Amino acid sequence: MGHPNIEQRKFTFCSMLAAYDLEHLITQCPECTRFFAACCPHETFGGDLALPNKKICHHFQLVFIDGACSNNGRDNAKAGLGMTIGDDEEYCWSITMEDAVDPDGPRTNQCAELLAAIEGLKQLENVNRIQAIDKAMGKGDSHHKPARRHTNDLRSTYIVVADSEYVVKGITEWFPTWRVRLS
Protein backbone atom coordinates (compact mmCIF):
# COMPACT_ATOMS: atom_id res chain seq x y z
CA MET A 1 0.00 0.00 0.00
CA GLY A 2 2.75 2.46 0.94
CA HIS A 3 5.75 3.64 -1.00
CA PRO A 4 9.19 2.05 -0.43
CA ASN A 5 10.75 5.50 0.09
CA ILE A 6 8.36 6.32 2.94
CA GLU A 7 8.45 4.62 6.31
CA GLN A 8 6.46 5.97 9.29
CA ARG A 9 5.59 9.04 7.21
CA LYS A 10 9.32 9.85 6.73
CA PHE A 11 10.67 10.15 3.18
CA THR A 12 14.16 8.96 2.31
CA PHE A 13 15.77 8.92 -1.08
CA CYS A 14 16.55 5.57 -2.68
CA SER A 15 20.01 4.22 -1.75
CA MET A 16 20.93 4.43 -5.45
CA LEU A 17 20.89 8.22 -5.01
CA ALA A 18 23.52 8.27 -2.24
CA ALA A 19 26.20 9.61 -4.60
CA TYR A 20 24.15 12.70 -5.48
CA ASP A 21 24.25 16.00 -3.60
CA LEU A 22 20.96 17.25 -2.18
CA GLU A 23 20.93 20.08 -4.73
CA HIS A 24 20.53 17.42 -7.46
CA LEU A 25 17.86 15.51 -5.56
CA ILE A 26 15.54 18.49 -5.21
CA THR A 27 14.32 19.15 -8.73
CA GLN A 28 12.35 22.00 -10.20
CA CYS A 29 10.12 21.68 -13.21
CA PRO A 30 11.19 24.26 -15.81
CA GLU A 31 7.61 24.46 -17.10
CA CYS A 32 5.64 25.02 -13.89
CA THR A 33 8.54 26.05 -11.53
CA ARG A 34 7.27 23.69 -8.82
CA PHE A 35 9.60 21.66 -6.60
CA PHE A 36 9.83 17.86 -6.59
CA ALA A 37 12.02 15.15 -5.11
CA ALA A 38 13.99 13.28 -7.75
CA CYS A 39 12.78 9.83 -8.63
CA CYS A 40 15.02 6.81 -8.35
CA PRO A 41 17.65 6.62 -11.12
CA HIS A 42 17.28 2.88 -11.72
CA GLU A 43 17.51 2.59 -15.48
CA THR A 44 14.55 0.22 -15.56
CA PHE A 45 12.39 3.07 -14.30
CA GLY A 46 14.00 5.83 -16.37
CA GLY A 47 14.10 8.09 -13.33
CA ASP A 48 14.85 11.81 -13.41
CA LEU A 49 18.59 11.40 -12.89
CA ALA A 50 19.04 8.48 -15.31
CA LEU A 51 18.73 10.53 -18.48
CA PRO A 52 19.83 14.12 -19.12
CA ASN A 53 17.09 16.60 -20.03
CA LYS A 54 14.37 14.16 -19.00
CA LYS A 55 11.03 15.63 -18.02
CA ILE A 56 10.64 16.07 -14.28
CA CYS A 57 8.46 13.49 -12.57
CA HIS A 58 5.71 15.25 -10.61
CA HIS A 59 5.03 12.41 -8.17
CA PHE A 60 7.00 13.48 -5.06
CA GLN A 61 5.62 17.00 -4.54
CA LEU A 62 7.56 19.17 -2.10
CA VAL A 63 6.28 21.93 0.15
CA PHE A 64 8.98 23.90 1.97
CA ILE A 65 7.69 25.37 5.22
CA ASP A 66 8.88 27.51 8.10
CA GLY A 67 7.29 29.10 11.12
CA ALA A 68 8.71 31.78 13.38
CA CYS A 69 7.77 33.66 16.51
CA SER A 70 9.22 36.72 18.20
CA ASN A 71 8.78 36.97 21.99
CA ASN A 72 8.16 33.22 21.98
CA GLY A 73 5.37 32.18 24.37
CA ARG A 74 4.73 35.66 25.78
CA ASP A 75 1.50 37.63 25.61
CA ASN A 76 2.95 40.05 23.04
CA ALA A 77 4.35 37.29 20.80
CA LYS A 78 4.03 37.72 17.03
CA ALA A 79 4.21 34.70 14.76
CA GLY A 80 4.07 33.93 11.07
CA LEU A 81 4.15 31.08 8.60
CA GLY A 82 5.88 30.71 5.24
CA MET A 83 5.28 28.06 2.61
CA THR A 84 6.37 27.50 -0.99
CA ILE A 85 5.91 24.79 -3.60
CA GLY A 86 7.68 26.62 -6.45
CA ASP A 87 9.34 29.82 -7.60
CA ASP A 88 6.30 31.54 -9.08
CA GLU A 89 4.59 34.07 -6.82
CA GLU A 90 1.36 32.03 -6.98
CA TYR A 91 3.25 29.18 -5.26
CA CYS A 92 4.61 31.20 -2.32
CA TRP A 93 2.56 32.11 0.75
CA SER A 94 3.06 33.90 4.04
CA ILE A 95 0.46 34.05 6.78
CA THR A 96 0.43 36.07 9.98
CA MET A 97 -0.70 33.97 12.93
CA GLU A 98 -3.76 35.64 14.36
CA ASP A 99 -6.67 34.39 16.42
CA ALA A 100 -8.48 33.28 13.25
CA VAL A 101 -5.56 30.96 12.41
CA ASP A 102 -4.68 29.88 15.96
CA PRO A 103 -7.23 30.95 18.59
CA ASP A 104 -5.73 29.06 21.55
CA GLY A 105 -2.88 29.99 23.84
CA PRO A 106 0.18 32.14 23.40
CA ARG A 107 2.12 32.19 20.13
CA THR A 108 5.18 29.90 20.05
CA ASN A 109 7.82 28.82 17.55
CA GLN A 110 6.67 25.20 17.74
CA CYS A 111 3.05 26.08 17.08
CA ALA A 112 4.09 28.28 14.14
CA GLU A 113 6.19 25.46 12.67
CA LEU A 114 3.34 22.92 12.97
CA LEU A 115 0.78 25.32 11.52
CA ALA A 116 3.14 26.06 8.62
CA ALA A 117 3.23 22.33 7.82
CA ILE A 118 -0.56 22.09 7.97
CA GLU A 119 -1.13 25.23 5.90
CA GLY A 120 1.56 24.20 3.40
CA LEU A 121 -0.19 20.88 2.79
CA LYS A 122 -3.53 22.69 2.42
CA GLN A 123 -2.04 25.08 -0.15
CA LEU A 124 -0.44 22.20 -2.07
CA GLU A 125 -3.75 20.34 -2.15
CA ASN A 126 -5.61 23.49 -3.29
CA VAL A 127 -3.17 24.06 -6.17
CA ASN A 128 -3.49 20.43 -7.25
CA ARG A 129 -7.30 20.59 -7.06
CA ILE A 130 -7.39 23.72 -9.22
CA GLN A 131 -5.01 22.17 -11.75
CA ALA A 132 -7.16 19.00 -11.88
CA ILE A 133 -10.28 21.08 -12.55
CA ASP A 134 -8.46 23.04 -15.26
CA LYS A 135 -7.27 19.80 -16.85
CA ALA A 136 -10.80 18.34 -16.79
CA MET A 137 -12.07 21.48 -18.51
CA GLY A 138 -9.35 21.23 -21.17
CA LYS A 139 -7.40 24.20 -19.82
CA GLY A 140 -4.69 22.32 -17.95
CA ASP A 141 -1.18 21.59 -19.10
CA SER A 142 -0.07 18.07 -19.91
CA HIS A 143 3.37 18.07 -18.31
CA HIS A 144 2.11 17.46 -14.75
CA LYS A 145 2.41 13.73 -14.67
CA PRO A 146 4.37 11.12 -12.76
CA ALA A 147 7.04 8.91 -14.28
CA ARG A 148 5.87 5.62 -15.80
CA ARG A 149 6.36 3.66 -12.60
CA HIS A 150 3.98 5.95 -10.67
CA THR A 151 1.05 5.71 -13.09
CA ASN A 152 -0.78 3.19 -10.90
CA ASP A 153 -0.62 5.50 -7.88
CA LEU A 154 -3.94 7.23 -7.26
CA ARG A 155 -2.34 10.34 -5.77
CA SER A 156 0.95 12.13 -5.79
CA THR A 157 3.02 11.92 -2.65
CA TYR A 158 3.26 15.14 -0.65
CA ILE A 159 6.50 15.77 1.24
CA VAL A 160 6.88 18.48 3.88
CA VAL A 161 10.41 19.90 3.92
CA ALA A 162 11.17 21.54 7.27
CA ASP A 163 14.19 22.64 9.28
CA SER A 164 12.30 21.97 12.50
CA GLU A 165 13.08 18.78 14.39
CA TYR A 166 9.77 19.31 16.21
CA VAL A 167 7.82 19.17 12.94
CA VAL A 168 9.76 16.17 11.63
CA LYS A 169 9.29 14.20 14.86
CA GLY A 170 5.68 15.38 15.10
CA ILE A 171 4.89 13.98 11.65
CA THR A 172 7.01 10.83 11.83
CA GLU A 173 7.07 9.74 15.49
CA TRP A 174 4.45 11.51 17.58
CA PHE A 175 1.51 11.71 15.15
CA PRO A 176 0.05 8.26 15.98
CA THR A 177 -0.04 9.16 19.69
CA TRP A 178 -1.53 12.59 18.98
CA ARG A 179 -4.23 11.01 16.80
CA VAL A 180 -5.22 8.55 19.57
CA ARG A 181 -5.40 11.36 22.15
CA LEU A 182 -7.63 13.49 19.94
CA SER A 183 -10.09 10.73 19.08
What are these regions (language model features)?
Residues 4-5, 14-115, 122-130:
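RNase H-like nuclease fold core
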Residues 69-72, 118-183:
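RNase H catalytic domain
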